[in-house]
Amino acid sequence: MSVYDAAFLNTELSKPTSIFGLRLWVVIGILLGSLIVIALFLLSLCLTSRRKNRKPRADFASAAIATPPISKEIKEIVPAQNQSVPAEIQVDIGKIEHRVVFSDRVSSGESRGTASASETASYSGSGNCGPEVSHLGWGRWYTLRELEAATNGLCEENVIGEGGYGIVYRGILTDGTKVAVKNLLNNRGQAEKEFKVEVEVIGRVRHKNLVRLLGYCVEGAYRMLVYDFVDNGNLEQWIHGDVGDVSPLTWDIRMNIILGMAKGLAYLHEGLEPKVVHRDIKSSNILLDRQWNAKVSDFGLAKLLGSESSYVTTRVMGTFGYVAPEYACTGMLNEKSDIYSFGILIMEIITGRNPVDYSRPQGETNLVDWLKSMVGNRRSEEVVDPKIPEPPSSKALKRVLLVALRCVDPDANKRPKMGHIIHMLEAEDLLYRDERRTTRDHGSRERQETAVVAAGSESGESGSRHHQQKQR
């Protein structure tokens, strides 16, 4: 191209056009850029459509191994196996009517699980298949359809409990097993966290004084936990409910309940590694079977405490009246916080009073302060629940009150460990049985002596009459 042609081309390109007075070369550049953008957009649409065509297969395959996300705070306590499958777990949560949509993402380093191919059956989101073996290696993975059938569509008539994070329903599975189904509701993500905590804390735990978790359901926005059904209500209902003038909870039964709770908590504190701090010990979380055996339930707020840690700092949660003062003030949590709550619960069982009751006169509102005052004024016998049919001996009552007062010591370091509490309670139980046996034996001897005296008297009178008849 000659110099003249280049100059002519430059002149033509520099001429203004009718499009906002832009020069010709600018307009050409805009057109070329627009064409490139359109081409890229069409290419992206093409790639997206191809991915969507392949996505259902991938989703179906991943659904077969999807499990509830595992909390970083609660790690699975299992021995190492030869083949471990690092689980980067992400549950795809869809929108379901009347349920809040929420999700939780964890990295592969936060959770690990072990499973073999035979442990996991194919899973259908529609709920057509029955419960399958859990990927976690314990329990069952129930479908939503099965749990809805068991609870009659989660109807209100089957509601047996309700809390801030969920509703508990009574249910019967197809094999006739009675279960309690806890449907967790979302509360700023707390339901998702509570689900993971409960699954990991009590999934593998087996103790006669801890409620047994049978399995769980993860489907859409639903998070459900399936427990053994404990068919005699909870301790709160039997202490504060309308049971008449005389409570069926005798002193012996109440002491057995206290001892059962202590054994369950001792297992959590001293029988597991890392130890488990329940964090919400209260009367409504103590279930009772037909033999009045206590079973600690509701581990949604539980925390793990490793052997290398003396406490864990966390947001203060629990139930007003049961929370240890040092935990409420600092957020520093350890097993001594549970022991404080346990002491409050002992007082509640003995007195039949709530930990905090604003309907009572001034000076009796706070159970701990009132009880300390009564014991200090040598009026211990007056604190016993008037509905107890047969009050305990003074010595037995004072020993149990001593255990309760030691548990609520303001200095957490002075509170006894749960194992020590069990020894004190068992000694008290033995003492009480010995006293009752001594009383019964003493009464029996008195009755025998009376019978002997009466028999001797009758024999003497009979002999005297016989002698008089012979004289006649």
From Swiss-Prot:
Source organism per entry reads Arabidopsis thaliana
Family as reported in the entry's similarity comment:
Belongs to the protein kinase superfamily. Ser/Thr protein kinase family.
Enumerate the catalysed reactions: L-seryl-[protein] + ATP = O-phospho-L-seryl-[protein] + ADP + H(+); L-threonyl-[protein] + ATP = O-phospho-L-threonyl-[protein] + ADP + H(+)
The cross-references to InterPro entries, in alphabetical order and at most eight, read:
Kinase-like_dom_sf (IPR011009), Prot_kinase_dom (IPR000719), Protein_kinase_ATP_BS (IPR017441), RLK_Ser/Thr-Kinase (IPR052232), Ser/Thr_kinase_AS (IPR008271)
- Start and end residues of each Protein kinase domain: 154-431
Keywords of the record = ATP-binding, Kinase, Membrane, Nucleotide-binding, Phosphoprotein, Serine/threonine-protein kinase, Transferase, Transmembrane, Transmembrane helix
The processes (GO biological process) annotated in the record are: protein autophosphorylation
Q: What is this protein called?
A: Probable serine/threonine-protein kinase At1g01540
For membrane topology, the record states:
Single-pass membrane protein
- The main enzyme category here is transferase
Q: Where in the cell is it found?
A: Membrane
Query: Where does the record place the modification Phosphotyrosine?
Result: 227, 327
